[in-house]
Amino acid sequence: MKSDLEIAREAHLDPIEKVAARAGIDEKYLEPYGRGVAKVDLDVVTHNRDHSCGKYVVVTAMTPTPLGEGKTTTAVGLAQGLEKIGKHSVLALRQPSMGPTFGIKGGAAGAGYSQVLPMEKLNLHLTGDFHAIGAAHNLLAAMIDNHLHQGNELDIEPHSISWRRVVDINDRALRNTIVGLGSRVDGVPRETGFDITAASEVGVILSLATSLSDLRARLGRIVIGYNRSKEPVSAEDLHAAGSMAVILKDALKPNLLQTTENSPVLVHAGPFGNIATGNSSVIADRVGIGCGDYLLTEAGFGADMGAERFFNIKCRIGGMRPDAAVLVATVRALKTHAGRYKVIPGKPLPPAMLEDNPDDVLAGAANLRKHIEIVREFGVSPIVALNVFPTDHPDEIDAVRKVAEAAGAHFASSTHVVDGGDGAVDLAHAVVAACDHKADFRYTYDLEDSLVEKLTKVATKVYGADGIDIAPAAAKELAHFEDLGYGTFPVVIAKTHLSLSHDPSLKGAPTGWRLPVREVRAAVGAGYIYAICGDMRTMPGLGRHPAAERIDIDDNGETIGLF
């Protein structure tokens, strides 16, 4: 089979105006960025308000291996498969971060004959949204340090400042830094650091904002630290929010691209799935829901991560109710959850893992069953989509089917990587069938619940924990947040994506464990409280041999080695 890059280059790209027309978007709403990409004006949301009758389907997954299980690829294949059976679809995806693109994971444009095009633009700068997020974020950081240097009129306590700087590259050397070194004219020395841009609260705000005015208001509510009276200091207090909004004005508009079979794709925002909300934008979904029979929207990592935040946060803010959820599974992930194999990024799979062994599949099935249960807990119909690899065996595929159907889920195997939309026709039919059953959608918690109650409900109802253990400092901070009026915020639990628990070594569906909450923070602009459980890093590092070593450019200006 040809490489992803070869397939992407050989694919026929329709003019973006034609792709927009296929989605019912008039050319007057487009701002083209070359032949294959366009920004979509926000007026489309108003124009489509009376036509918002498409089915709303979230694409999530079982707990993945470190390699990922092909969720984006499956979402692309499904969009193409729906077109094959005469159902118009629009796909909404997050924009990939350049950090993982140059790291081990590589890009996030799909694979094989189920890719988003132009692939190179998508995996790199696209229309510059991430640069705008970084610029707005770092402008606020600069204004904080300038305020300290100019006399600190707001009486900010420097040690309370939580607003770090960001860059869209994996760079562990920047995790902890000291700024303001030099002479007195170079600022006030203090410890700080860098996060990756995908971890920025500004990026989360972009993904959750429902309008330009909402974006502006959320930016103003960002809390960067506290004054010496322990009162929050906001971006509005620093007079930074207006300039930040100006930088982000165009970034608020979704980006229109296409699949290898020319189906429309809206790519917008890219907050991380383990430490942030992990979903594409509310605005992109509002655009897409009025443009097709089915809107497919991808949520990061497993159903315990991005999908939980999709249901409890994104759907609340967007005011939309999902009709079904696609759970992507793989034979290799099921075998990993049997606890008998170790998958290491950058290394080949263990040879024994590729042998025909349905017993190993069944031994890891508890994880898939738990994710089906999670989706059903939200009152939504689950469809297990088995992303088939060439090394999978028929009786292993049949074992997955039996597990899924016994747990009350629809099931379809899919060969979309090799066969494009034709390989996802069965999956498309399964999604249509699931959407025919009216969902009884419900949230995990009420916003009126206390913050502790919300965290407990997510831990017990979604993850399967027996309860939560809150560190004394975290408990004190939660009480402080309640006093500040943040008690009605939804919650995000920042934890590993490699386990249903906080411990990446616990595979399957762990029982008899409690979730330790060691720290809590407030993302006031985005509008949620997040609890940190386990060792979570907001700035990744590069591996021994990152993908960046293999990427180059030839004499004709063609990229080499991007995947």
Swiss-Prot record:
SUPFAM superfamilies from the entry? Answer: P-loop containing nucleoside triphosphate hydrolases
Q: Which domain of life is it from?
A: Bacteria
Instruction: List GO BP terms, alphabetically.
Output: tetrahydrofolate interconversion
Its pathway? One-carbon metabolism; tetrahydrofolate interconversion
A single Pfam family it belongs to is FTHFS
- Could you tell me which InterPro entries the record lists for this protein? Formate_THF_ligase, Formate_THF_ligase_CS, P-loop_NTPase
Q: Which UniProt keywords apply?
A: ATP-binding, Ligase, Nucleotide-binding, One-carbon metabolism
Q: What class of enzyme is it?
A: ligase
GO molecular function annotations of the record: ATP binding; formate-tetrahydrofolate ligase activity
Q: Which reaction does it catalyse?
A: (6S)-5,6,7,8-tetrahydrofolate + formate + ATP = (6R)-10-formyltetrahydrofolate + ADP + phosphate
Q: What is its EC number?
A: 6.3.4.3
Q: Say if the entry is tagged with keyword DNA damage.
A: no
Q: Which sites bind ATP?
A: T65, P66, L67, G68, E69, G70, K71, T72
Of which family is this protein a member? Belongs to the formate--tetrahydrofolate ligase family.
What protein name applies here? Answer: Formate--tetrahydrofolate ligase
Q: Which organism is it from?
A: Cutibacterium acnes (strain DSM 16379 / KPA171202) (Propionibacterium acnes)
Which gene produces this protein? fhs
